[in-house]
């Protein structure tokens, strides 16, 4: 958080110096001017469509002056798939939904920019329904277990459950990107912005809940309800699940700095900046 704040303050200070009508080291830096033909603040509007790891994105931007744009972003994407891992079949769905804003800073009269910002709305997550057919094996934390067959007498049912991978620990995630291209170009109306950076979404969370009956042997002579920690079989299965969850969380920890790489096409309305 402190590093992001330092970067943002440094970028803003540098840009203000570039835009101020003062003299530094004997050179006069470019000032923000609103002469004939110049675009006044909020006088231009641009829309952009593109893709990024956050999903299919739609953006809108307006000019503040010749060095600053204010940009809003919305991202949406869903994808469903079914796969089997370690004997567990998962019907998974990726849901990406986020929205945020950025201040595009152009320190030079070119397409290069620095963009501090934040995701104000972040509902990115993966959900899954898990099943293990009765009589088949599965592994948790390198331990082999067996899913019980349905039995009306004992009440046994095959192992099943749900899982949620949260990519939204920080409900407001600060971001910093850099890139090339101005959604509000000095000439023409079309532009092709590109940016790269990251959002600090926080460490991903993993929550897996399994139910049904689990066995220690294929013959199903030593079985228990998965949730029955009072039974040695259930206790062993729950312990293996908790350890496995911790490993998944560790493996996914690098995603706390969520990558942003995006490109798209933009169209702007209104007059042009000089």
Regions found by a protein language model. Name each.
Residues 1-36, 230, 270-274:
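Cleavable N-terminal export/targeting peptides
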Residues 33-40, 74-101, 123-172, 202-260:
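Extracellular/periplasm-exposed beta-strand and loop segments of Gram-negative cell-envelope proteins
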Residues 38, 50-52, 59-61, 104-106, ...:
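Transmembrane beta-barrel domains of outer membrane proteins
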Residues 39-45, 56, 66-68, 110-112, ...:
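Outer-envelope beta-barrel architecture signal
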Residues 47-49, 60, 72, 103, ...:
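Membrane-embedded beta-strand positions of outer-membrane beta-barrel proteins
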Residues 64-68, 105-110, 182-186, 269-273:
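Outer-membrane beta-barrel strand-turn architecture
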Residues 255-274:
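Outer-membrane beta-barrel "beta-signal"
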């Amino acid at each position: 958080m402190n590093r992001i704040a330092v970067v943002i303050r440094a970028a803003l200070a540098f840009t203000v110096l570039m835009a101020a009508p003062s003299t530094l080291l004997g050179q006069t830096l470019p000032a923000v001017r609103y002469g004939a033909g110049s675009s006044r603040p909020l006088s231009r509007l641009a829309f952009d469509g593109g893709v990024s790891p956050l999903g299919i994105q739609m953006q809108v931007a307006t000019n503040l002056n010749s060095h600053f744009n204010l940009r809003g972003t919305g991202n949406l994407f869903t994808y469903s798939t079914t796969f089997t891992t370690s004997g567990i079949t998962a019907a998974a769905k990726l849901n990406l939904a986020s929205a945020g804003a950025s201040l595009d800073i152009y320190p030079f009269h070119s397409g290069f920019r620095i963009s501090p910002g934040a995701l104000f709305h972040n509902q990115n997550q993966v959900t899954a329904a898990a099943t293990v057919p009765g009589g088949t094996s599965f592994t948790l934390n390198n331990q082999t277990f067996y899913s019980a067959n349905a039995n009306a007498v004992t009440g046994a049912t095959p192992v099943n459950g749900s899982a949620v991978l949260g990519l939204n620990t920080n409900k407001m995630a600060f971001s910093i990107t850099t890139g090339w291209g101005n959604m509000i170009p000095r000439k023409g109306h079309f532009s092709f912005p590109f940016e790269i950076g990251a959002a600090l979404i926080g460490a991903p969370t993993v929550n897996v809940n399994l139910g049904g009956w689990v066995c220690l042997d294929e013959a199903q002579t030593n079985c228990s309800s998965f949730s029955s920690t009072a039974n040695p079989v259930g206790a062993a299965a729950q312990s293996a699940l908790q350890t496995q969850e911790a490993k998944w969380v560790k493996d996914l920890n690098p995603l706390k700095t969520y990558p942003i790489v995006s490109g798209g096409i933009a169209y702007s309305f209104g007059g042009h900046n000089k």
